[in-house]
């Protein structure tokens, strides 16, 4: 990869020459309503600290704001607040509905877009669309409450209220540019899109996270220097200054709870909402001495119709000398040009401008979604100066007292999901590796570190329930990162791989001991991240008739995990030959798991099995007593076994310095020929290659016949999570006198299961599609050009598996691409987004997508795993121009070179 100015900054950060990552977009979009801030008796996090309290109540564990930044430990924070003269409160944070208020669960209602960002955050840009009329808080709450009774009704969005009619809104753009690691220029540009002049109050705000109200930590201080600068003093942080030339006034209060407003008790004279009350109501709630722990610079201006207002600030070390420094506009332009060069070097030549825009905004969303996550479970359970409610010691996450989270983590969505999710994070790292290998490696290992991983080896799922089980993707993601680094730099980071394998061993041991309840290598799994894809709530522990559910995907994930561990050990064995023994161990473990896929057939005398020979699909099986009931739901669960695959070059292994692994496979082939035949075959493009897989050639063809059928799983925009066939033919089953069923819902969920904001019963989900694409390429590497399938089924077009993978990638990318009419499928029927050029190209990366038309659904800023579209665009560009960039993901890698971290 070309060494751009941004690459040089990454090198400086890696080698300790400059701490470029010290400041970044680590402020959450929402801290209220989180588990961390919940001290209620019943664990009702959304109600304990609601949006209406957020402006008045000091947070215990983090901060939030609009387009904000903080230092790595979130000691000092900066964000933008605004007022249009009509809202009942300042716009200090984005507004959205809680899980109970939204008709499909929690839902942010403000419109904001992450447009640009670099991995050192030397350049960042985001856009917020602020209505000029009074923000319709009551209308959004009331209408969505009315619609909640019928989940088939669409969500009532901000644009539906009419607040943007006549273009009466401001486009507010925040730009950040770093001169040095601790010298940051901030430009705020307000564009009046309306037909009339309109007032705006801008209040860029600097404050300290409250660390002093809960214990003995000393209280920091902000104060005014003259009329255009705010200075900081903190016992543990370097002194900083915020220069605000041209501000009308500097306003100060304390980041402390307004106990008088909330509980009628005496409290601070200038509380957290003091600036809000002063601006909106004229209250005497700002400190006339111009000092405190929260401060804002005020600009009150009239912006003419079609006109713009721009202000520039500078956050820098107290020793910087003050002012904006030399040529602030030139610095902004330079950092933008450097960002252009950085991203141009990461896309193959020939990538269309539209795809380049999509990829860049996807990367921007990934980088903006870094968040400081603070949660010390022991302290949280015990409470602070005020004792927590009784019974808390046995409440949520009480078995995870060792967790001491105080890290910057890539979030799924910093408003709807402002907490880590273990399997989401794995997908994030695959995208992050394209821009920041060091950060990606740290992130993929993070939840397996001792301050997160349970002593028994379990990885925490997410703050609502650390005990839940997510698919074990950490080693897969780590291998993706290592392969990408080796392909693009020629280095194999064996130090990273050793850490990955060591932590993975602990997790694998927990997985097989905990989730294999009967010791037969069939895995119950539980939740496994696919929310409502099952007929039953798999995380509840309840099954009809007190039965046991044998999950096709649970066993698949276990086999997948074993293969990833085997491949990691094989990579390390290139430089540490003793790892061949570990690789052989995981090969054998995979074989036993694969054999268990047929275990039910033996135990039930052929009456049930995970593989259904007649349908050519895998199904979950429910056992109640001596009865085995296949749950014939045609879903991603049916297809997932194809992802457990590895293609081995036996000739290369035999020719290596330590051919022990090849010898072990040869022994296994001789001694356990029947079992070996189930999982491994050499029928392909070369006899020296061995395919290790849960599915043989025949089963793969049959699975693909369903997966690539437009009447079943194949949409114009990727693979559906549930077959379209279930629209006309819903699955029904009766067990113990109770009826259960599942139907095709291509859009939002029609039930309240898992809060109602997630749906795996029809929509397209980017992460599992990417796993399927990856598996197709690995199968192709073995079978080669001779293995073709009809794609789509019924078209008469025959494709190799590599071509099918490219076709699926194109369909997923097409969700975001503008057609000849300029319309983007992601926007669905939203007229303003489809027709207004100012809205059409500022993209949102939704959680999942309509199974028929590709419209975005769910969390609007889940760039996390949906950011994988950037990887797909890169891969498609390399496929179209194989000579223009490093080899594709599965080409033969260069020789290993040990690399430290």
What residues fall within each predicted segment?
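Structured, charged N-terminal subsegments at the starts of enzyme catalytic cores
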Residues: 65-70, 78-81
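Acidic, mature catalytic/reactive cores of soluble proteins
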Residues: 1-56, 74-76, 83-901
């Amino acid at each position: 990869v070309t060494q751009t100015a941004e690459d040089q900054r990454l090198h400086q950060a890696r080698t300790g020459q400059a701490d470029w990552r010290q400041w970044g977009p680590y402020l959450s979009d929402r801290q209220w309503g989180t588990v961390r801030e919940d001290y209620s008796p019943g664990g009702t996090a959304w109600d304990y600290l609601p949006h209406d309290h957020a402006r008045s109540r000091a947070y215990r564990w983090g901060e939030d704001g609009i387009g904000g930044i903080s230092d790595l430990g979130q000691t000092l924070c900066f964000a933008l607040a605004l007022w249009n003269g009509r809202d009942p409160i300042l716009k200090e944070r984005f507004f959205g509905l809680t899980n109970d208020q939204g008709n499909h669960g929690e839902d942010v209602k403000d419109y904001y877009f992450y447009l640009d960002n670099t991995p050192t955050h030397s350049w960042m840009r985001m856009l917020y669309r602020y209505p000029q009329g009074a923000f319709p808080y009551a209308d959004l709450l009331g209408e969505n409450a009315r619609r909640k009774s019928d989940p088939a009704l669409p969500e009532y969005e901000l644009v539906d209220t009419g607040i943007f009619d006549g273009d009466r809104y401001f486009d507010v753009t925040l730009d950040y540019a770093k001169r040095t690691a601790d010298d940051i220029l901030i430009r705020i540009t307000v564009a009046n899109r309306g037909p009339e002049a309109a007032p705006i109050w801008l209040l860029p705000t600097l404050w300290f996270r409250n660390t002093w109200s809960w214990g003995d930590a000393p209280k920091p201080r902000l104060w005014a220097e003259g009329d255009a600068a705010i200075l900081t003093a903190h016992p543990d942080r370097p002194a900083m200054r915020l220069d605000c030339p041209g501000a009308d006034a500097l306003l100060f209060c304390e980041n402390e709870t307004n106990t008088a407003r909330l509980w009628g008790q005496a409290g601070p004279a200038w509380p957290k909402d003091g600036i809000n009350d002063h601006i909106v109501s004229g209250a005497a709630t700002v400190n006339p001495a111009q000092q405190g722990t929260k401060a804002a610079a005020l600009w009150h201006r009239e912006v003419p119709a079609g006109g713009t207002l721009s202000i520039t600030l500078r956050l820098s070390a107290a020793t910087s000398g003050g002012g904006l420094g030399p040529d602030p506009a030139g610095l902004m332009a330079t950092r933008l040009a450097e960002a252009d060069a950085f991203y141009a070097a990461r896309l193959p030549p020939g990538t269309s401008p539209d795809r380049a825009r999509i990829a860049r905004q996807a990367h921007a969303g990934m980088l903006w979604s870094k968040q400081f996550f603070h949660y010390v479970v022991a302290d949280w359970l015990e409470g602070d100066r005020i004792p927590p409610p009784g019974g808390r010691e046995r409440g949520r996450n009480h078995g995870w007292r060792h967790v001491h989270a105080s890290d910057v983590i890539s979030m799924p969505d910093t408003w709807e999901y402002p907490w880590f999710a273990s399997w989401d994070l794995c997908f994030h790292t695959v995208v992050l590796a394209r821009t920041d290998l060091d950060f990606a490696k740290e992130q993929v290992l993070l939840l397996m570190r001792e301050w997160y991983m349970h002593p028994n080896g379990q990885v925490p799922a997410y703050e609502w329930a650390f005990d839940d089980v997510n698919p074990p993707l950490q080693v897969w993601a780590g291998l993706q990162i290592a392969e990408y680094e080796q392909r693009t730099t020629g280095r194999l980071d064996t130090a990273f791989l050793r850490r990955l394998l060591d932590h993975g061993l602990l997790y694998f041991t927990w997985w097989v001991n905990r989730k294999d309840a009967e010791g037969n290598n069939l895995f119950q799994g539980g939740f496994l991240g696919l929310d409502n894809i099952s007929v039953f709530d798999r995380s509840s522990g309840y099954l009809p008739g007190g039965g046991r559910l044998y999950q096709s995907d649970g066993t698949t994930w276990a086999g997948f995990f074993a293969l990833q561990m085997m491949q990691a050990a094989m990579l390390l064995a290139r430089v540490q030959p003793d790892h061949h023994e570990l690789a052989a161990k995981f090969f054998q473990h995979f074989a036993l798991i694969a054999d268990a896929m047929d275990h039910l057939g033996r135990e039930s005398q052929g009456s049930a099995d995970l593989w259904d020979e007649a349908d050519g699909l895998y199904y979950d099986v429910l056992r109640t007593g001596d009865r085995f009931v296949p749950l014939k739901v045609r879903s991603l669960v049916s297809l997932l076994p194809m992802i457990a695959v590895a293609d081995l070059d036996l000739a290369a292994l035999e020719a290596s310095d330590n051919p022990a692994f090849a010898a072990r496979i040869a022994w296994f082939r001789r001694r356990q020929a029947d079992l070996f035949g189930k999982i491994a075959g050499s029928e392909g493009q070369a006899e020296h290659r061995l395919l290790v897989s849960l599915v043989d050639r025949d089963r793969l063809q049959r699975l693909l016949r369903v997966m690539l059928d437009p009447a079943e799983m194949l949409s114009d925009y990727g693979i559906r999570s549930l077959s379209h066939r279930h629209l006309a033919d819903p699955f029904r089953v009766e067990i113990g006198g109770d009826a259960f069923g599942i139907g095709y819902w291509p859009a939002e969920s029609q039930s309240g299961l898992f809060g109602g904001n997630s749906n795996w019963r029809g929509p397209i989900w980017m992460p599992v599609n990417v796993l399927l694409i990856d598996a197709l390429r690995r199968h192709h590497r073995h079978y080669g050009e001779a293995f073709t399938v009809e794609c789509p089924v019924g078209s008469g077009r025959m494709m190799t598996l590599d071509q099918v993978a490219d076709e699926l990638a194109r369909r997923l990318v097409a969700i975001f691409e503008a057609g000849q009419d300029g319309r983007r499928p992601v926007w669905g029927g939203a007229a303003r987004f489809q027709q207004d050029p100012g809205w059409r190209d500022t993209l949102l990366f939704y959680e999942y997508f309509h199974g028929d038309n590709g419209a975005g659904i769910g969390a609007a800023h889940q760039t996390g795993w949906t950011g994988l579209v950037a990887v797909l665009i890169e891969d498609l560009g390399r496929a179209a121009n194989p000579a223009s960039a490093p080899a594709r993901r599965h080409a033969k890698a260069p020789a290993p070179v040990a690399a430290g971290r």
